[in-house]
């Protein structure tokens, strides 16, 4: 039976609508607490402890209180980190040897959405069987622990400072950032106090933007999903580089002094090239079905195997573990470097990119010279609910014709949305006109067959 609530990145939705309601989140905390209390990892007679962090959405206060109440009712102690990037919660959970970590965030979504995601004691996302066990407990009545068995809650002292020191520890001790002017866009999100300190303490001249959260402006015209604000700030301040994080700081985009934007695909190539220079070789790297073909070709030219995972950092992580590799990324800016952190971390990834540039003495444009991204055309086609697009001969014929015309110099990717009756048609080609033409032809075939 499929999962009812957990998606690829926890539970997410619009605040006030199921399942992101205070009563459900209280029961979720209770259910998760009961699963943790029954875990073999909890020593006999001891009480599990979980860490809760959140981003800056106004609803975070309500959901934090609901989670805290649920955990307490299950007999689980709670530590409150306050505003904390998702990767910060993962790190602190592992470093403090806690039973689990919980993040209240909807990442890059607008303020009226929110979500809950969990980390295991080792700082990784929960395995599927644990999520299934939590869902099973949601169906059971809530039976509050006796008064002498209730969980307690307290604030974690200097949570931000601990995470800042961890981030700095991933940057080579032989380097610093003196002489660099950096614009840091924190998306009015969880890293608004943390990220500027990290780069400043390493010596950079930091110009922070997106650091005035009011509960309603997270990701609003700023951050990794709205990089125009960063481009303008870099140009206006004559900065060397700009770094944009999203609301929970697990992804990034980078802008150079000219205002050119670099996505996760390109940054993955930069990091792989750096590892080749320092370690002699890189066995392989992981991208997704959406990774630009030019990056795959460039990595293979360097002798690096490349594997495509399904879209989602969870699936990139699965492939990295399966192959025993370290580096993976999504074009959206989720970058995994498993010898540095157990999860995607926008701040740490930015530091890795800066270290790579320091070591090479080159700019991003110079490192990526010869890697020209193929133009992509994405068309979202709305279908009738339940339409059988896979069984359509006309759609199959349009796809086959496009693939034959591209003949290895491009790609066709057809992917159904997991949340709405939409088919995503993406074509990648060396020439933009070819990508547009083939995408529109396939989209027309989809419309004719499914609407």
UniProtKB/Swiss-Prot annotation:
It is an enzyme of class 5 (isomerase). It holds the Pfam family PGM_PMM_III. It comes from the Bacteria. GO terms for cellular component: cytosol. CDD domains: GlmM. Binds 1 Mg(2+) ion per subunit. GO terms for molecular function: magnesium ion binding; phosphoglucosamine mutase activity; phosphomannomutase activity. Activated by phosphorylation. Its EC number is 5.4.2.10. The modification Phosphoserine is found at residue 107. GO terms for biological process: carbohydrate metabolic process; peptidoglycan biosynthetic process; UDP-N-acetylglucosamine biosynthetic process. Its cofactor is Mg(2+). This is Phosphoglucosamine mutase. The active site is at 107 (phosphoserine intermediate). The keyword Coiled coil does not apply. Belongs to the phosphohexose mutase family. SUPFAM superfamilies: Phosphoglucomutase, C-terminal domain (SSF55957), Phosphoglucomutase, first 3 domains (SSF53738). PANTHER family: PHOSPHOGLUCOMUTASE (ALPHA-D-GLUCOSE-1,6-BISPHOSPHATE-DEPENDENT), PHOSPHOHEXOSE MUTASE. Mg(2+) binds at residues 107, 246, 248, 250. It comes from Burkholderia cenocepacia (strain HI2424). Catalyzes the conversion of glucosamine-6-phosphate to glucosamine-1-phosphate.
